[in-house]
């Protein structure tokens, strides 16, 4: 009897890798598995994979030999040099037309390079974003594949089978994103938006707890209620759960109150913020969210500064509150929703700029649909983003779409009230206030940049355009009126 061949091989049996192949096997695919620590292969095949269609492999040679052609090998390993290391080990074992898939959180430029390098060797490469964490990998993640388009037909049946499904019609949260590094780029932007969402929620929590004095029980009920409306999303849902969790050893203490207020980060938010500068897009909310995590890491310095620097104590703001709690709760909800809309608008504007810069053909409406299920930023209004781009594929900014415009208009009063409360009571809300500032800047017909241009011309002779002739010849002025050179050769800002 001929031994069964694997439909796909997976390298890297950490939790994400294990859950992905369990998902694949549950959809009818036979999976060959390999891990550098070979005992991990045996543990998996005899443990979680026992009695299922898995082929355990103790070498890369065995893995490759066990696969149907064209061979599909998926890497679920640490991003960076480790991916390149395994690619180099696989190359002598593969044939032209075989496919290597990187499912880790790789930088999009690495995926772009790998696509080109492997194409020259006859190997098809896919760099794919996989979102949803451990649970998503097992039950259905959002998958964002990019790379060599010739590879897509060979992995599409597997990826769309294992991805999350949404209504109507069980649509898969997986479709081809674009060439080269496009898949990992979209995943990077997804992660940046995730940073923003988490920071916005934490700022809403801070105001509700420290300004209004809500208990954890009240916070749980508030977020659970919010999850039934416009804010219905995965992160709001899990936040409500977090406020309900008590310590096992001390049932009178909530877990959230025992956690050190110093946030970690893996770097994908930083990548997003850096690239926003490269493509010239003000991704202010994501950048502030990254910086907020940086500030949080200075715990000892903050504790010292709290006894030195003047200003209202944000942790004791609730001692002065005497107003209508329900009204402020609604204002915070409005601020959270409006700021969230700004974050997504900035993210999609950035993807448009990147598509132009890197010559990708991105379908923004379809990208929004990829995020409707399985992923960390899934939320109900993603369908509205799809609708906005269906109505106007050339839409410059989601904020100008009628649905977004009307929602932002309805949230104005609460949004501005929350920003005012934060400033007056010393409550740090960098994401809320940066979102509002971006919104006000974007809708301002005439900004203060004319003075910036004048200053640049004064010290650096950088010239400027005239208001009544914006596309005319650059102008330089002798600002002192005393003749001679007024510009510095030292500065170029």
UniProtKB/Swiss-Prot annotation:
Binding site for substrate: 105, 131-133, 190-191, 195, 266, 293, 456, 462
Positions annotated to bind NADP(+): 12-17, 35-37, 77-79, 105
Record Pfam families: 6PGD (PF00393), NAD_binding_2 (PF03446)
Transmembrane segments: none
A GO cellular component annotation in the UniProt record: cytosol
InterPro entries documented for this protein: 6-PGluconate_DH-like_C_sf (IPR008927), 6PGD_dom2 (IPR013328), 6PGDH_C (IPR006114), 6PGDH_Gnd/GntZ (IPR006113), 6PGDH_NADP-bd (IPR006115), 6PGdom_BS (IPR006184), NAD(P)-bd_dom_sf (IPR036291), Pgluconate_DH (IPR006183)
Pathway(s) where this gene product acts: Carbohydrate degradation; pentose phosphate pathway; D-ribulose 5-phosphate from D-glucose 6-phosphate (oxidative stage): step 3/3
Keyword presence, NADP: yes
Subunit structure: Homodimer.
Function statement: Catalyzes the oxidative decarboxylation of 6-phosphogluconate to ribulose 5-phosphate and CO(2), with concomitant reduction of NADP to NADPH.
Family: Belongs to the 6-phosphogluconate dehydrogenase family.
Entry protein name: 6-phosphogluconate dehydrogenase, decarboxylating
Gene, per the UniProt record: gnd
